[in-house]
């Protein structure tokens, strides 16, 4: 029912749900626990389904929750478009400190890159840049939100090699819109060892 695609990061995958369409539209089961389990995309029970709305140029991240409230996420864009960025911050992982940037946008039968989800396991930092006004993210999480367990890595940490400037230029973003809070996160090198592989 779903297609699992390697991202180059250990344990992090692009997910393509099945889509059944005709001239009236389409139906897509965007989460089936049994299919996820069969593909090794494990959730410790879905606790919440969240949505966020962002203007063009908004950058959020790079966020995670610390143990024991760390979260697995299944992320998709249901309106607009965004580039989703994930960083492996698990010490000892073969892809520690590496990142992937994935274009996410709603399903369009004429666009092979559309309708993708991103499976973000525990031990990864997550963020994105919104490419259009009124971009809406939807994501499932397997642990509840815990403000005192919030963590983050500086979104533009130079050691991570994320080509934010290239993204901004390609999509006509003159100046990213970021929060003061996200600008205060430490770089990965200066951060505590939150996760072990």
Region spans (language model):
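Short strand-turn motif at the edge of the Rossmann-like AdoMet-binding core
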Residues: 141
């Amino acid at each position: 029912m779903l297609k699992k695609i390697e991202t180059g990061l250990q344990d992090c995958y692009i997910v393509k749900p099945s889509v059944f369409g005709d001239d009236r539209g389409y139906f897509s089961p965007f989460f089936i626990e049994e299919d996820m389990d069969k593909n090794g995309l494990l959730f410790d029970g879905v606790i919440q389904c969240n949505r966020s709305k962002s203007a063009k140029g908004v950058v959020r991240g790079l966020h995670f929750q610390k143990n024991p409230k760390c979260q697995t996420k299944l992320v998709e864009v249901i309106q607009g478009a965004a580039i989703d960025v994930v960083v492996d911050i698990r010490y000892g992982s073969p892809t520690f400190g590496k990142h992937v940037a994935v274009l996410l946008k709603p399903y369009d039968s004429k666009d092979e890159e559309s309708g993708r989800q991103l499976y973000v396991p525990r031990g990864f930092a997550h963020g994105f840049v919104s490419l259009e006004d009124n971009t809406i993210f939807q994501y499932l999480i397997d642990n509840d939100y815990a403000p005192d367990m919030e963590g983050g890595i500086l979104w533009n940490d130079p050691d991570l090699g994320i080509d934010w400037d290239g993204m901004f230029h390609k999509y006509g973003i003159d100046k990213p819109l970021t929060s003061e809070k996200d600008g205060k996160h430490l770089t990965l090198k200066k951060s505590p060892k939150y996760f072990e592989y």
